[in-house]
């Protein structure tokens, strides 16, 4: 499946595997708070995050309404990120794709998750068939757009390289 997404969309398979490993431990951990409650709490408890959280809560309600999902049924992080790819609602609404062709963009089904991550990276500057992952490269910046932390990108890139090295060695 990873190779199918990689071949179809042109995104490095090791990067895809690295991202879902960092974000959700390959789907094992994707949050313990309901996304609705997490965002609502941010609005009222952290004034400096209130405007952002209000926008994300609105995006989440749009997502749930459009897919006939109970807004209290999806668990995520304290910041409202959810699913195997830990998308925030606005990112999910803007970048998630229906890779498996079942007419639904799933946050918890691997074909759609991997396809959506690849789509996010591509829409944020990832260059297919470019093996430059050095700091400041377009591929590095596409991961930085996913999570705006230099440390995060560094860890993702280190894990990507380690996975690649181990697979190539075997």
Question: What are the language-model segments listed below?
Answer:
Residues 1-170:
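Catalytic glycan-binding domains that act on GlcNAc-containing polysaccharides
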